[in-house]
UniProtKB/Swiss-Prot annotation:
Keywords on record: Hydrolase, Metal-binding, Zinc
Entry cofactors: Zn(2+)
Example GO molecular function: hydroxyacylglutathione hydrolase activity
Ribosomal protein as UniProt keyword: no
Subunit description: Monomer.
EC code: 3.1.2.6
Organism: Polaromonas sp. (strain JS666 / ATCC BAA-500)
Gene3D superfamilies noted in UniProt: Ribonuclease Z/Hydroxyacylglutathione hydrolase-like
Protein name: Hydroxyacylglutathione hydrolase
Length: 263
Protein backbone atom coordinates (compact mmCIF):
# COMPACT_ATOMS: atom_id res chain seq x y z
CA UNK A 1 0.00 0.00 0.00
CA UNK A 2 1.30 3.42 -0.97
CA UNK A 3 -0.08 6.48 0.84
CA UNK A 4 0.29 9.92 -0.70
CA UNK A 5 -0.78 12.75 1.60
CA UNK A 6 -1.74 15.90 -0.30
CA UNK A 7 -1.59 19.22 1.55
CA UNK A 8 -4.16 21.56 0.03
CA UNK A 9 -2.86 24.75 1.62
CA UNK A 10 -6.39 26.10 1.82
CA UNK A 11 -8.04 28.07 4.62
CA UNK A 12 -9.61 24.90 6.02
CA UNK A 13 -6.18 23.25 6.25
CA UNK A 14 -7.37 20.08 4.51
CA UNK A 15 -5.35 16.98 3.80
CA UNK A 16 -6.43 14.88 0.81
CA UNK A 17 -5.12 11.35 0.27
CA UNK A 18 -4.35 8.91 -2.50
CA UNK A 19 -3.96 5.24 -1.58
CA UNK A 20 -2.43 3.18 -4.35
CA UNK A 21 -1.78 -0.46 -5.13
CA UNK A 22 1.92 -0.80 -6.01
CA UNK A 23 1.23 -3.69 -8.39
CA UNK A 24 -1.56 -2.25 -10.53
CA UNK A 25 -1.28 1.51 -10.04
CA UNK A 26 -4.97 1.73 -9.17
CA UNK A 27 -5.73 4.37 -6.55
CA UNK A 28 -8.42 5.45 -4.13
CA UNK A 29 -8.84 9.19 -3.53
CA UNK A 30 -10.04 10.17 -0.05
CA UNK A 31 -11.93 13.46 0.28
CA UNK A 32 -10.27 15.01 -2.81
CA UNK A 33 -11.39 18.60 -2.26
CA UNK A 34 -8.39 19.94 -4.16
CA UNK A 35 -9.17 18.05 -7.35
CA UNK A 36 -6.40 19.75 -9.30
CA UNK A 37 -3.67 18.62 -6.90
CA UNK A 38 -5.24 15.18 -6.57
CA UNK A 39 -5.38 14.61 -10.32
CA UNK A 40 -1.93 16.09 -10.87
CA UNK A 41 -0.41 13.88 -8.18
CA UNK A 42 -1.98 10.76 -9.67
CA UNK A 43 -0.74 11.75 -13.11
CA UNK A 44 2.84 12.28 -11.92
CA UNK A 45 2.80 8.96 -10.06
CA UNK A 46 1.31 7.12 -13.01
CA UNK A 47 -1.72 6.03 -11.00
CA UNK A 48 -5.30 5.58 -12.16
CA UNK A 49 -7.94 6.82 -9.71
CA UNK A 50 -10.68 4.19 -9.83
CA UNK A 51 -12.52 5.06 -6.61
CA UNK A 52 -13.29 8.14 -4.55
CA UNK A 53 -14.27 7.90 -0.89
CA UNK A 54 -15.85 10.60 1.24
CA UNK A 55 -15.40 10.20 4.98
CA UNK A 56 -18.48 12.36 5.51
CA UNK A 57 -20.81 14.79 3.83
CA UNK A 58 -19.31 18.24 4.55
CA UNK A 59 -18.44 20.29 1.47
CA UNK A 60 -14.77 20.67 2.35
CA UNK A 61 -14.53 16.90 1.85
CA UNK A 62 -16.94 16.38 -1.06
CA UNK A 63 -16.31 19.53 -3.08
CA UNK A 64 -13.83 17.91 -5.47
CA UNK A 65 -15.87 14.79 -6.22
CA UNK A 66 -17.43 15.91 -9.49
CA UNK A 67 -14.18 17.04 -11.09
CA UNK A 68 -12.24 13.93 -10.10
CA UNK A 69 -15.01 11.60 -11.25
CA UNK A 70 -15.45 13.49 -14.52
CA UNK A 71 -11.74 13.16 -15.24
CA UNK A 72 -11.33 9.52 -14.22
CA UNK A 73 -14.70 7.75 -14.24
CA UNK A 74 -14.08 6.72 -10.63
CA UNK A 75 -16.86 5.25 -8.51
CA UNK A 76 -17.96 7.18 -5.41
CA UNK A 77 -18.07 5.50 -2.00
CA UNK A 78 -19.61 6.91 1.18
CA UNK A 79 -21.50 5.92 4.34
CA UNK A 80 -24.58 3.90 3.50
CA UNK A 81 -26.81 6.60 5.01
CA UNK A 82 -25.12 9.48 3.20
CA UNK A 83 -26.89 9.07 -0.13
CA UNK A 84 -29.25 11.95 0.56
CA UNK A 85 -26.36 14.17 1.62
CA UNK A 86 -23.73 13.34 -0.99
CA UNK A 87 -24.63 13.39 -4.68
CA UNK A 88 -23.89 10.43 -6.91
CA UNK A 89 -22.90 7.76 -4.38
CA UNK A 90 -22.25 4.46 -6.18
CA UNK A 91 -21.55 2.33 -3.13
CA UNK A 92 -22.81 2.83 0.41
CA UNK A 93 -20.64 1.11 3.00
CA UNK A 94 -21.26 -0.15 6.52
CA UNK A 95 -19.02 -1.14 9.41
CA UNK A 96 -16.85 -4.10 8.44
CA UNK A 97 -17.15 -3.62 4.69
CA UNK A 98 -13.85 -3.86 2.85
CA UNK A 99 -12.73 -1.58 0.04
CA UNK A 100 -10.21 -3.20 -2.29
CA UNK A 101 -7.78 -1.11 -4.30
CA UNK A 102 -6.02 -3.01 -7.04
CA UNK A 103 -4.68 -6.43 -6.08
CA UNK A 104 -2.99 -5.75 -2.76
CA UNK A 105 -4.81 -3.06 -0.79
CA UNK A 106 -7.69 -3.74 1.60
CA UNK A 107 -9.29 -1.01 3.69
CA UNK A 108 -11.86 -1.84 6.35
CA UNK A 109 -14.70 0.61 6.94
CA UNK A 110 -15.37 1.77 10.49
CA UNK A 111 -18.72 3.41 11.23
CA UNK A 112 -17.56 6.36 13.34
CA UNK A 113 -20.43 8.71 14.19
CA UNK A 114 -19.88 11.89 16.14
CA UNK A 115 -18.57 14.67 13.91
CA UNK A 116 -21.54 13.76 11.75
CA UNK A 117 -23.76 10.72 11.99
CA UNK A 118 -22.67 9.51 8.54
CA UNK A 119 -18.92 9.46 9.13
CA UNK A 120 -16.62 6.61 8.26
CA UNK A 121 -12.94 5.99 8.91
CA UNK A 122 -10.78 3.49 7.06
CA UNK A 123 -8.38 1.02 8.67
CA UNK A 124 -5.80 -0.64 6.47
CA UNK A 125 -5.14 -4.36 6.51
CA UNK A 126 -1.36 -3.91 6.55
CA UNK A 127 1.47 -5.09 8.79
CA UNK A 128 1.54 -1.65 10.34
CA UNK A 129 -2.09 -0.53 10.27
CA UNK A 130 -3.10 2.94 9.17
CA UNK A 131 -6.22 4.89 10.10
CA UNK A 132 -7.68 7.46 7.72
CA UNK A 133 -9.72 9.35 10.27
CA UNK A 134 -11.39 12.21 8.40
CA UNK A 135 -12.75 14.70 10.91
CA UNK A 136 -13.13 12.22 13.77
CA UNK A 137 -9.61 12.00 15.17
CA UNK A 138 -7.09 14.77 14.55
CA UNK A 139 -3.47 14.96 15.59
CA UNK A 140 -3.78 15.96 19.25
CA UNK A 141 -7.52 16.59 18.91
CA UNK A 142 -11.05 15.47 18.15
CA UNK A 143 -13.64 16.61 15.63
CA UNK A 144 -16.34 19.11 16.53
CA UNK A 145 -20.04 18.31 16.51
CA UNK A 146 -21.36 21.64 15.21
CA UNK A 147 -22.89 20.55 11.92
CA UNK A 148 -24.93 17.40 12.28
CA UNK A 149 -22.92 15.72 15.03
CA UNK A 150 -23.39 14.46 18.57
CA UNK A 151 -20.82 14.60 21.36
CA UNK A 152 -21.99 11.41 23.04
CA UNK A 153 -21.67 9.51 19.77
CA UNK A 154 -18.19 10.99 19.27
CA UNK A 155 -17.16 9.86 22.74
CA UNK A 156 -18.43 6.35 22.04
CA UNK A 157 -16.47 6.26 18.78
CA UNK A 158 -13.29 7.21 20.63
CA UNK A 159 -13.80 4.88 23.58
CA UNK A 160 -15.24 1.84 21.84
CA UNK A 161 -13.35 1.94 18.54
CA UNK A 162 -10.38 4.25 18.11
CA UNK A 163 -8.77 3.78 21.52
CA UNK A 164 -8.84 0.01 21.01
CA UNK A 165 -6.88 0.03 17.76
CA UNK A 166 -3.24 -1.15 17.90
CA UNK A 167 -0.83 1.40 19.32
CA UNK A 168 1.33 1.33 16.18
CA UNK A 169 -1.59 2.48 13.99
CA UNK A 170 -0.56 5.41 11.79
CA UNK A 171 -2.97 8.35 11.97
CA UNK A 172 -3.92 10.24 8.80
CA UNK A 173 -6.47 12.98 9.64
CA UNK A 174 -8.52 15.19 7.35
CA UNK A 175 -7.00 18.49 8.52
CA UNK A 176 -3.79 19.92 9.95
CA UNK A 177 -4.73 21.35 13.35
CA UNK A 178 -1.82 19.97 15.33
CA UNK A 179 -0.26 23.23 16.52
CA UNK A 180 -3.47 24.67 17.92
CA UNK A 181 -4.48 21.30 19.34
CA UNK A 182 -1.19 20.92 21.20
CA UNK A 183 -1.65 24.39 22.67
CA UNK A 184 -5.07 23.26 23.87
CA UNK A 185 -3.49 20.15 25.40
CA UNK A 186 -1.02 22.28 27.33
CA UNK A 187 -3.79 24.61 28.49
CA UNK A 188 -5.62 21.58 29.89
CA UNK A 189 -2.56 19.60 31.00
CA UNK A 190 0.39 21.98 31.48
CA UNK A 191 2.70 19.20 32.64
CA UNK A 192 2.28 17.10 29.48
CA UNK A 193 5.89 16.40 28.51
CA UNK A 194 5.06 14.89 25.12
CA UNK A 195 3.08 17.95 24.04
CA UNK A 196 5.82 20.28 25.25
CA UNK A 197 8.43 18.35 23.31
CA UNK A 198 6.45 18.25 20.06
CA UNK A 199 5.08 21.80 19.95
CA UNK A 200 8.28 23.59 18.82
CA UNK A 201 8.60 21.31 15.78
CA UNK A 202 5.07 22.07 14.56
CA UNK A 203 4.96 25.79 15.33
CA UNK A 204 4.55 27.58 11.99
CA UNK A 205 5.53 24.31 10.29
CA UNK A 206 4.98 23.20 6.72
CA UNK A 207 2.10 20.69 6.94
CA UNK A 208 3.25 19.04 3.71
CA UNK A 209 6.30 17.83 5.64
CA UNK A 210 4.55 17.09 8.92
CA UNK A 211 5.45 13.81 10.61
CA UNK A 212 2.82 11.08 10.78
CA UNK A 213 1.88 10.16 14.34
CA UNK A 214 0.83 6.80 15.73
CA UNK A 215 -2.03 6.04 18.07
CA UNK A 216 0.55 5.51 20.81
CA UNK A 217 1.77 9.08 20.23
CA UNK A 218 -1.79 10.37 20.33
CA UNK A 219 -2.41 8.69 23.68
CA UNK A 220 0.50 10.68 25.06
CA UNK A 221 -0.55 14.17 23.93
CA UNK A 222 -4.15 14.06 22.70
CA UNK A 223 -6.30 15.29 25.58
CA UNK A 224 -9.34 13.45 24.22
CA UNK A 225 -7.48 10.17 24.73
CA UNK A 226 -6.31 11.14 28.24
CA UNK A 227 -9.63 11.35 30.04
CA UNK A 228 -8.41 9.74 33.27
CA UNK A 229 -5.41 12.05 33.70
CA UNK A 230 -5.55 13.67 37.17
CA UNK A 231 -4.02 16.82 35.72
CA UNK A 232 -6.69 17.06 33.00
CA UNK A 233 -9.49 16.52 35.51
CA UNK A 234 -8.07 19.01 38.03
CA UNK A 235 -7.76 21.74 35.40
CA UNK A 236 -11.22 20.89 34.06
CA UNK A 237 -12.69 21.45 37.52
CA UNK A 238 -11.45 25.05 37.41
CA UNK A 239 -13.80 25.66 34.48
CA UNK A 240 -16.59 23.43 35.80
CA UNK A 241 -16.66 23.66 39.63
CA UNK A 242 -19.65 21.31 39.81
CA UNK A 243 -17.70 18.48 38.21
CA UNK A 244 -18.07 15.30 40.34
CA UNK A 245 -15.13 14.16 42.46
CA UNK A 246 -14.62 11.21 40.14
CA UNK A 247 -16.20 12.22 36.82
CA UNK A 248 -16.88 9.50 34.28
CA UNK A 249 -14.94 9.53 31.04
CA UNK A 250 -17.95 10.54 28.96
CA UNK A 251 -18.43 13.68 31.06
CA UNK A 252 -14.75 14.61 30.85
CA UNK A 253 -14.80 14.17 27.07
CA UNK A 254 -17.93 16.31 26.66
CA UNK A 255 -16.56 19.09 28.86
CA UNK A 256 -13.25 19.09 26.99
CA UNK A 257 -15.10 19.32 23.69
CA UNK A 258 -17.12 22.23 25.08
CA UNK A 259 -13.93 24.07 26.00
CA UNK A 260 -12.29 23.26 22.68
CA UNK A 261 -15.27 24.82 20.89
CA UNK A 262 -14.28 28.16 22.43
CA UNK A 263 -10.52 27.76 21.94
Amino acid sequence: MIVERIWTGNAYRNFNYLIACPETGEALAIDPLDHEKTLATARVKGWQITQVLNTHEHHDHTGGNAAVIAATGAKLIAHHKAGGRIAGVDRGVKAGDVIKVGKTVELECLDTPGHTMCHICLRSHTEQPALFSGDTLFNAGAGNVHNGGDVNALYATFAEQLARLPDDTLVYPGHDYIENNLRFTLAREPDNAAAKALLPSVTDHDPAKSAVTTLKDEKEFNTFLRLSSPSVIARLRESFPDLPDEPDARTVFAKLRELRNQW
